Amino acid sequence: MLNVNWKLIGKTGLDRFRPALWECLREGYSWKTFASDAVAGLIVAAVALPLAIAFSIAAGLPPQAGMATAVVAGLAISAFGGCRVQIGGPTGAFIVIIYGIYAQFGMAGLMAATAMAGVMLVVLGLCGLGSIIKYIPYPVTVGFTSGIALIIFAGQIEALLGLDCSTALAGAKMPGDFLGKLAIYARSFPTINWAAVGISIATLAICIGWKRVTQRVPGSIVAIVMTTLAAMALRSLGVEVETIGSRFPEVAGGMTLALPKGMDWGAVDFRALFSPALSIALLAGIESLLSAVVADGMIGRRHNSNTELIGQGIANILSPLFGGIPATGAIARTATNIKNGGRTPVAGILHALFLLLVMLFLGRYAALIPMATLGGVVAIVAYNMSEWHLVKGLLRSTRSDVLVMLTSFLLTVLVDLTVAIQAGVLLAAFLFIRRMGESTEARDVTRLLAGHDEGRRPDDLGQPGIVIPEGTEVFEVYGALFFGAADKFKDTLLSHAHKLPRVLILRMRHVLMLDATALHSLEEVYAHTHARGVTLVLSGVTAQPLMLMVRSGFLDRIGQDNVHSHIIDAIARARQLLATTTSTDKRAQRTPKEAR
């Protein structure tokens, strides 16, 4: 029976949980630092406010869901995360996932999936797997991020153009898929509202141009204020523009931190929610750790990946308890925090508290904001997410990277994010395995030295005084010996060793890794040669392959006398074996004469 030391595992897991807030307070916290954090927190709150509302509505949810997430998850990420300056909350990357889960499983399913994702993140952090998410290939990340950006932008066409899709939908819900939405928008195009188009253009112009005026006040806040006033003026003239209040009438009564009423928890299928929850966890982990790495470069410190994942997990467990949605670290808000003087998690906590005050006391005024304005704000976010310059750079990369990126992009747009990440990672892994297998080779050094093969001679075999004796063949192996290269390795040896030498030296100084499949191929080579009277000698075996050979018993089968650290010793062993074989043959020839 396996004995597991759960106390040790628990102690190790808790040792990985070292929130940055605790470390900052232990180092000492001054009023000067608090003042700097307070200013940064206020500015970041101004940036986060319109985004929290816009992202929530873009996902098909009321604005209080996004605000609750910005408050609860934003506070938890700062309090329990492993990055000093991380700002958390709802992000545009989650819009696609949230929309799909909400459409299929309802609000209860979305809350359950968010909490499940939080548990997954906590487990990953406690198990010390904070770095495993970093192994997702870069082309996969660029591909699905660009795909999400395109879907987000497409989802804002209704708001940007002020379309009335009710006739085209005929009482049904808006399709969750990309092509389905475009079809509905195309049929609804005659209902375009030119006043909404004007507000959308004004929003885009203000958000883009305001940066030239000042970066202390977010352009999105200015756009919301100005376009809301414009919409009120148009309404007084009899021109109607859809607002948050007209789509979500309950907002006029104010916002609260509470679970939505009327949810059927008994209908939640937790097994069916595992895959969506995994998508949330992966995306939250990727986004938060990427944001933390960017923050490290800006402040000259290093974050704790495991603690950051635990903090993200806690935030996603708490967020749905107050009516929130999935959350993660936000790169743009984190950068804004740093640029405005935020240096400790207190800035993130204050940003959440400022948003809470706005939510409780000014939330009812969100009903006046035009939907076209939010569409413009989200469209800007989608453009920034797309990072087309990275896509252009990858298109000039290897064909394998381009294939992985395009696969992730197309699957994100046409299928869903879960399939895109899984397929992208698998495709990247298979292509990497193929490249690694192609780079592994076994070269016949004997033929090369004799001038029968082209190529560079191994450095020390051409030295004076080192001569490969007749009846010996030497093969030099380059690269990793693993399942992707095992057959190629075996076929090369067996096809080139056509003369059946008496001694076959396998030089393995450039083989740093050996797996079970490659070891099995090596066993087959040994069996093939041994059955034909050929002795296999190994030279320069590195640590990991040698350890595997010892554990598997392969070293005992070929004999430890036939394993040497240097090629000179291996050649000396070959001479010894050849001399022994020669003397044995001579005695065998004399024996019949003596018998007569």
What are these model-predicted stretches?
Residues 1-453, 485, 553-554:
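Transmembrane helical cores of multi-pass ion-transport proteins
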Residues 1-18, 574-596:
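Intrinsically disordered or compositionally simple regulatory linkers and C-terminal tails
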Residues 87, 538, 563:
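Conserved SAM-binding loop
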Residues 98, 182-185, 489-493, 570, ...:
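Generic hydrophobic alpha-helical segments
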Residues 246-249, 534, 561:
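A structural micro-motif
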Residues 384-557, 575-581:
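The feature marks cytosolic C-terminal regulatory regions of anion transporters and related permeases
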Residues 557-573:
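Short acidic-hydrophobic, aromatic-tinged amphipathic segments that line or gate anion-handling sites
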